Amino acid sequence: LSALLNTSILLRSGVTVTWAHHALMENNFDQCLQGLLFTVLLGLYFSFLQGLEYMEASFTIADSIYGSTFFLATGFHGLHVLIGTIFLMICILRHLSATFSQHHFGFEAAAWYWH
């Protein structure tokens, strides 16, 4: 169930970051901010749930090849999500300081990284 929920969260975050990107291209800065905020919240929620999943796991990284593979793969993906969340938080700060243009490369790079 947890894997399905995490997948759903990440798919929704892809929708919200795309919403933010399209809003930015249309100079709709309020919707861009909303999309960014939703995406960051979903990224943080995903990270929280992944941490819970690690704490509740009945195996460790040292138990077997399955444990090693599981923690390595999900750990790298979790790190990717955390870095992407930080990128998007920086975009929110830049957005609030009114330094965004319709095609702000920093935002576009963060959105590419997120996908």
Curated annotation (Swiss-Prot):
Bilayer-spanning residue ranges: 32-52, 70-90
A Pfam family the protein falls into: COX3
Subcellular location: Mitochondrion inner membrane
EC number per UniProt: 7.1.1.9
GO molecular function per UniProt: cytochrome-c oxidase activity
UniProt topology in membrane: Multi-pass membrane protein
Principal location class: mitochondrion
An individual GO BP term: mitochondrial electron transport, cytochrome c to oxygen
Gene3D superfamilies: Cytochrome c oxidase, subunit III, four-helix bundle (1.20.120.80)
Entry keywords, A to Z: Membrane, Mitochondrion, Mitochondrion inner membrane, Translocase, Transmembrane, Transmembrane helix
Family: Belongs to the cytochrome c oxidase subunit 3 family.
Subunit text: Component of the cytochrome c oxidase (complex IV, CIV), a multisubunit enzyme composed of a catalytic core of 3 subunits and several supernumerary subunits. The complex exists as a monomer or a dimer and forms supercomplexes (SCs) in the inner mitochondrial membrane with ubiquinol-cytochrome c oxidoreductase (cytochrome b-c1 complex, complex III, CIII).
PANTHER family, sorted: CYTOCHROME C OXIDASE SUBUNIT 3 (PTHR11403:SF7), CYTOCHROME C OXIDASE SUBUNIT III (PTHR11403)
Function in brief: Component of the cytochrome c oxidase, the last enzyme in the mitochondrial electron transport chain which drives oxidative phosphorylation. The respiratory chain contains 3 multisubunit complexes succinate dehydrogenase (complex II, CII), ubiquinol-cytochrome c oxidoreductase (cytochrome b-c1 complex, complex III, CIII) and cytochrome c oxidase (complex IV, CIV), that cooperate to transfer electrons derived from NADH and succinate to molecular oxygen, creating an electrochemical gradient over the inner membrane that drives transmembrane transport and the ATP synthase.
Protein name per its UniProtKB record: Cytochrome c oxidase subunit 3
Organism ancestry: Eukaryota, Metazoa, Ecdysozoa, Arthropoda, Crustacea
